[in-house]
Amino acid sequence: MEEVTELAELDAMIVVDEAYAEFSGVSVIPLIEKYPNLIVLRTFSKWAGLAGLRIGYSISHSEIAKRMMAIKQPYNVSTIAEAAACAAIRHRDVGLRSVNLLVLERER
């Protein structure tokens, strides 16, 4: 986290890939409020097992989010991927239970 804080002090956009955040328990999301140049990327590929659907999201300052929405392509997410992501969110507890089991096995 210290490295990200140092980078976020620069006059540049800083993008952090948190694809494995659910497995590590570490996130820089709390830094976004202080550093509006910080963008965090998350995916449903790992914790929810949706790798083939290529769906994820970003977390950023509202101004950055507005800019990204203005330039995104229409229909950039398939209906199937969107439905699967919504189901993963609704049943997040099930997915996170699996993550916790994997983490316990890793630490064993």
Functional labels for PLM-detected ranges:
Residues M1-I14, E18-W47:
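Active-site pre-lysine segment of PLP-dependent enzymes
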Residues N37-R108:
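PLP-dependent aminotransferase class I/II
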